[in-house]
A protein has these predicted regions:
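Short beta-strand edge/turn micro-motifs at domain boundaries
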Residues: 132-162
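A short gly/proline-enriched turn/hairpin at secondary-structure junctions
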Residues: 60, 66-76, 87-92
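Surface-exposed, charged secondary-structure patches
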Residues: 83-125
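Bacterial N-terminal signal peptides that target proteins for export
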Residues: 2-16
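Hydrophobic pocket/interface hotspot
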Residues: 45, 57-58, 65, 77, ...
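Short, low-complexity N-terminal intrinsically disordered segments enriched in polar/charged residues
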Residues: 21-63, 162-168
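A mature extracytoplasmic/lumenal domain signature
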Residues: 71, 114-118, 152
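Beta-strand elements of well-folded, non-transmembrane domains
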Residues: 50, 118-122, 139, 156
């Protein structure tokens, strides 16, 4: 009956759909950027540990963080975390491999779940220690930076040696 009006409605609906899609792609892109940013944060932990940089490692945690490592009592607060790692870091040549399974950001909270493989060769004895499992790092945004609020790892039967890259 009104062909010209129908064309405008169709054109309007098409434009609205394009605008909605463009906003969706911006949101997906922003989420991907945050996930990449969080993946980089996860890599910092392994880098500082491998380099025996205790001070660098401590910069990654909030003051009231909790660390719960398999086979160890939970550590509450930065002082306990520092004390624990100070007796271990730098005592062995350590190499980590990480396989991120999930990275998500929700406002000022983010988390990473990853498979990990650790190979540590004692600097004095040459004895090799291997560990593999799954970890959960929960991050809080603090003063514009992502900081670890919870660091949990566990042994798990579906993550075992050798590491996928061939690290052995």
């Amino acid at each position: 009956m009104f062909p010209r009006l129908t064309r405008f409605r169709t054109l309007g609906a098409f434009c609205a759909a394009l605008m909605a899609l463009s906003m969706l792609s911006v949101a997906v892109s922003a989420q991907t950027d945050f996930e990449t940013e969080i993946a980089v944060e996860g890599g910092k932990w392994a880098k500082y540990y491998e380099q025996a940089d205790l001070e660098g490692l401590m910069t990654l945690y909030v003051d009231d963080a909790i660390v719960a490592l398999h086979g160890q009592p939970a550590l509450f607060g930065i002082a306990a975390i520092r004390e624990y790692f100070s007796t271990r870091i730098g005592k062995a040549e350590s190499v980590f491999e990480l396989d991120y399974e999930l990275r998500e950001t929700h406002g000022d909270i983010a988390y990473i779940i990853s498979k990990y493989w650790l190979k540590a060769t004692d600097n004095e004895t040459g004895v090799v220690y291997k560990d593999a499992g799954r970890s959960l790092l929960v991050y809080k945004k603090q003063d514009g930076q992502w900081k670890i609020a919870a660091d949990i790892d566990q042994a798990t039967p579906d993550v075992a040696w050798p590491a996928p890259s061939g690290l052995n």
